[in-house]
Regions:
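Outer-membrane beta-barrel translocator domains and adjoining extracellular loop/strand segments
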Residues: 42-48, 83-90, 126-133, 174-181
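Residues that define the transmembrane beta-barrel architecture of outer-membrane proteins
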Residues: 26-28, 49-55, 94-98, 143-149, ...
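Outer-membrane beta-barrel architecture
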Residues: 58-60, 101-103, 152, 188-190
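Outer-membrane beta-barrel "beta-signal"
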Residues: 37, 152-161, 181-193
């Protein structure tokens, strides 16, 4: 009889342990991420420009503040900018940023998350290219500081691999004259370290 009770107790302990592993809470972590950028600029009154293709790469740290919520600061290098095409040629504004987003992440389920939060950015380089019939001597000098909001979501595996999509809604003026704001779609892959 003692053997039966001991065996039952052992089975209960094993079953509880397996269940706890299956429903384990999220753990704070750090990692690297990178991916594809699709960026444009919204000019007030003139609509949105053509898109520039680029990439982003950087590091993140995720700290859980409850079972379903975390805060994730990131430090990213990001290629942004825009393109304008007309009958005479193509103008491309290439802007490279160091961005610092701070995101609140919500996990409605174990693997899916939604995120939102502010971002500040510092332009570290800019370059203008004009390919067409006539060359342009006009200089565009963008502001060095950018800020805005990010919104996104994604999927995170139990092994720490993340697939995410994010939209950056720039709120800072890109140029001193006129209203122009960054708009960036980011498609990312991240790896917890």
């Amino acid at each position: 009889m003692k053997t039966i009770y001991s065996t039952l107790a052992l089975l209960v302990v094993i079953a509880t342990s397996l269940h706890a592993q299956d429903t384990a809470t999220h753990q704070s972590n750090a990692g690297i991420k990178g991916g594809y950028n699709l960026s444009a600029v919204s000019f007030d009154g003139d609509g949105e420009t053509g898109q520039r293709h680029g990439f982003h790469i950087g590091v993140y740290g995720e700290s859980f503040i409850s079972e379903s919520f975390s805060i994730q600061p990131e430090l990213l290098y990001s290629q942004q900018g825009y393109e304008i095409k007309d009958a005479n040629g193509t103008f491309t504004q290439k802007l490279d940023y160091i961005n610092l987003p701070i995101l609140l992440k919500a996990y409605p389920s174990k693997n899916f998350y939604l995120e939102a939060g502010p971002q500040i950015g510092l332009a570290i380089s800019h370059k203008e290219e004009y390919n067409g019939l006539f060359s342009s001597s006009q200089e565009y000098d963008p502001n060095n500081f950018d800020w805005g909001m990010n919104f996104g979501g994604g999927f995170k595996t139990g092994s720490g691999i993340t697939l995410g999509v994010r939209y950056h809604l720039g709120l800072g003026d890109l140029y001193d004259q006129g209203k122009a704001h960054n708009r960036v779609w980011q498609f990312s892959v991240g790896f917890d370290l």
